[in-house]
Amino acid sequence: MRSLLLWIAVVVCLLCSVAAVVQSGSSDGFGKPRDTETAISFLEYKLMAPSVPMIPLTLIHGADSKGAVCLDGTLPGYHLDRGFGSGANSWLIQLEGGGWCNNHRSCVYRKTSRRGSSKFMEKALAFTGILSNRSEENPDFFNWNRIKLRYCDGASFSGDSQDESSQLFYRGQRIWQVAMEEFLSLGMKQANQALLSGCSAGGLASILHCDEFRELLPSSTKVKCLSDAGMFLDSVDVSGGHSLRNMFQGVVTVQNLQKDLSSTCTNHLDPTSCFFPQNLVSDIKTPMFLLNTAYDSWQIQESLAPPTADPGGIWKACKSDHSRCNSSQIQFFQEFRNQMLFAVNSFSNSDQNGLYINSCFAHCQTERQDTWFAQDSPQLNGKRVAESVGDWYFDRAKNVKAIDCPYPCDTTCHNLIFE
């Protein structure tokens, strides 16, 4: 098993987004922010080959006239690498992840980072994994039009309100709409194939917007959706509380998301429950592929054992490196895996849907070359992630659904270790 070392001390210096501001040794809402998303993003950057082409940032000019702006009022942006050959009329839209802001302070903080302002976004990004333009790295989508839509609203491209006093613009839904208008004008309206994808908070966004994406395109266009590490569960944390539910409740309340959530869900559940994908995926009409690790690193760090639920630090070593967990802690993770499998059970009954749940301690596998398609990539039933997604999208195989055996049986994992 290959383990990947991720140096949190270095990452803190590069901190530029907040999943939810959590304090160390502070109870009043102030202190050093922790950010697992940035830590994982830093690891992905370190894994990229130096020869990877850089794709420039394009701002959506005129978006501000429609109120489609980042948290700080700046223009939203994207990176586009044009398709070629047989893929010239095929489109892949990758929605960026990066946590959420769940209160006034964390949303204000994001205004000073790329997660809330295009002023701080990288001027160019490396396209790897599912975004790569090389057939040997991305066999099925390498020659498609590949777009990465940047994330700067803090609510998974949802919400349409603002905080006048702090000049905070919660305009994720408008950003989604103007971005889609832009892509349609660039040629996506003539697409013969399209895939809406996303990682983490972007994976949740792919779930939230999947059917909406389908409706944008002609019925003759083949449209499917992929959610990578987007199955955030409404789980009990190590203290018996509901850390992620509390966070999501803040997101829904602060950004006034109620009106943007699925009415099919809100007709029988509260708005916060309808931000959890486990209550949404079975009602999606468009074919959807769920890719997730059974022991999602972000959820372990921020939902199951955040510092607020573990003030004594009993879980600190275990959540940083699973090899340092005791048997009861591993059992807690096994119960989380069982919840994951239960959450996708109804979804998996549909023949049109795809599933890939591997028993790894990781987060986001589509944009990392080592986990998407490499010689030693993780495998399930002899298939790497890219191969399974391709089999499902192009209907090369029936019933593309793979669920791994429980930890520690999978020796192909690329596990994340935080030190």
From Swiss-Prot:
Known role: Hydrolyzes acetyl esters in homogalacturonan regions of pectin. In type I primary cell wall, galacturonic acid residues of pectin can be acetylated at the O-2 and O-3 positions. Decreasing the degree of acetylation of pectin gels in vitro alters their physical properties.
This protein's name: Pectin acetylesterase 6
One Pfam family in the UniProt entry: PAE
InterPro entries named in the record: PAE/NOTUM
UniProt keyword Nuclease present: no
Family: Belongs to the pectinacetylesterase family.
Keywords: Cell wall, Cell wall biogenesis/degradation, Glycoprotein, Hydrolase, Secreted, Signal
Any one Gene Ontology cellular component term annotated for this protein: extracellular region
GO terms of molecular function: hydrolase activity
Subcellular localization(s) per the UniProt record: Secreted, Cell wall
Taxonomy of the source species: Eukaryota, Viridiplantae, Streptophyta, Embryophyta, Tracheophyta
Signal sequence, renumbered to the chain: 1-20
E.C. designation(s): 3.1.1.-
Domain of life: Eukaryota
Record flagged with keyword Cell wall biogenesis/degradation: yes
Glycosylation site positions: 133, 326
Active site: 200 (charge relay system), 296 (charge relay system), 363 (charge relay system)
Knockout consequences: No visible phenotype under normal growth conditions.
Gene Ontology terms describing biological process: cell wall organization
